[in-house]
């Protein structure tokens, strides 16, 4: 995880960097190239430590996030180093070759191009602002506002944009990932294999500590089970608010490193105060509900976990985000568990009838994902999203509707049953960190 701010505006970028710098506590680099200022904050997790921006000839790039398949493209010391060679080989559409969680900005001075790339589910924040002849691109909205831009816009996921560097006219764009909606697979084996690979790629090639929040639910249970299967060194934290204690205790008995947290009133409000001042704001209006991460009690629970992880030098957080939005739509068999469910989790014979449903890309996908990103980012921690792996999502879409509808969160349930990992069948309990404070 990193963060960046880029602008042609004459401003001192370090004055815009207070919140953004928390995402990249290892180093901050600032360069001015042909009248454009580049600021990059680095959290070093993968490969050799490479400062950004990366410059090759007349092309400059910055990366926030991870490219998991970078070693397929050559002998690179770090993932960011593959970007410009791929751009030179494939052109503007090079991002279709990437497997990762990323936001990327490239400036090609020779061609007078500004290019932005955001991964399939916009897992890494990216904001843009234009004002008369000035423009800015940043990981955080606050950086652009502090630079004097009035109305920054959040860049949507699964897209690439090309702008003329002189007048900001859009001269190219495309969708990075096109999903196939043919529901033709009649077993869960390929989904399970894709899930195992999704975990493996997110825990490899790093010496940083790995952790997750472990509840009694399906999603964190599956991640924990697979980490155990792969022999990964990790820590699991549980906020004992409204969790099923029997299930949680069974799970923790299987761990070498776990902590059950009975969150106190004082700590809850200490975390709330820290997030109020040191976490980026995120408000999102939606047709189902509006959202403010600083009013979400789950933010305080995640903050309490990240504070402990930070002290233990654990820098990689594996999140279960996306499973509810994609695999269940917050419902089952047509019954909505929450009102923001689009179709009650009853998948039709033809996915074209509903795809993309609201929370696939939008709604709680954006709201809760950015809660994960911004809260963890305030502690210098990178969030990774196994359930938003594009191949895993594709494998789910390929499952027949009968397999999707067989049981609640069917492929995850199948996986947990395969490995006899304890879980509450058919149960969905939201993360209510403000409940049962001690």
Task: Please annotate each region the language model reported.
Residues 77, 406-410, 425:
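Non-catalytic, surface-exposed connector residues within folded enzymatic/regulatory domains
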Residues 8-11, 110-115, 179-420, 435-437:
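ATP-dependent adenylate-handling active sites, centered on carboxylate activation for C-N bond formation
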Residues 53-54, 98, 330, 381, ...:
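Short clusters of hydrophobic/aromatic residues that line enzyme substrate/ligand-binding pockets
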Residues 31, 410-413, 427-430:
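Short, flexible loop/turn segments with low-complexity composition
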Residues 1-273, 315:
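Cysteine-centered catalytic environments shared across enzyme families
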Residues 81, 85, 268, 424-437:
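Short linear loop/turn motifs
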